[in-house]
Amino acid sequence: KKIFIFFLIFNLTFVSSAQAAGVFVDSFDISNEDTLPQSLVFNPDGTKMFVVGRAGKDINEYTLSTGFDVSTASFVDSFDVRNEETQPKGLAFNNDGTKMFVVGYTDDEVLEYNLSPGFDVSTATFVDGFSVRSEDLIPSGLAFNNDGTKMFVVGQRDDDVNEYTLSTGFDVSTASFVDAFDVSNEESSPLDLKFNHNGTRMFVTGYNGKDVNEYTLSTGFDVSTASF
């Protein structure tokens, strides 16, 4: 399998979708590590890349000698999550990489791990899990706001983005459900989601449409205010 990296060039104000254009740049083959790659995440400077492997049931870590340039990537290590989840899908980190979060649809949980040092999966240890089964039986992607007091899980069964609050940032044991936003008009099998820095733009990828759907949020990181 190959990871295809699309560089989206946005105007800093994110005023209109006309200001964004996707241009194919390069690809990087990860088939030696996994044949069913799922979510893709970078560290802040792009010198580390992480890919969820559903076949291997693990998180694969790569280094990039040039940040965000996949042609410079090389495999480092992997971390097996099968003791907690046999169908891992989505992945997220806190800001310094000392916490890693994995969501999967075997147990329908967001799993929390500690890493020391940050962004080094070889040091990961399991901490806790938070069930999202009441909201969706096929959770496939997740994201947090900047301080970890909000968590978002996209679900393939109900085709929505579920929002949670965390009373302690990046601590899933303190999570509680808030609201959901339906994306079925745009995508009937959503896979993953990302936000811009202030949460006023949300991007949802989908299997059926094979595209990236963009939404505006009049209140940052509040899905009840989202519009396509």
Where in the sequence are the language-model features?
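A short beta-strand motif characteristic of beta-propeller blades
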Residues: F24-S31, S74-R82, T125-R133, S176-S184
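Boundary at the C-terminal end of the N-terminal hydrophobic targeting segment
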Residues: A18-A20
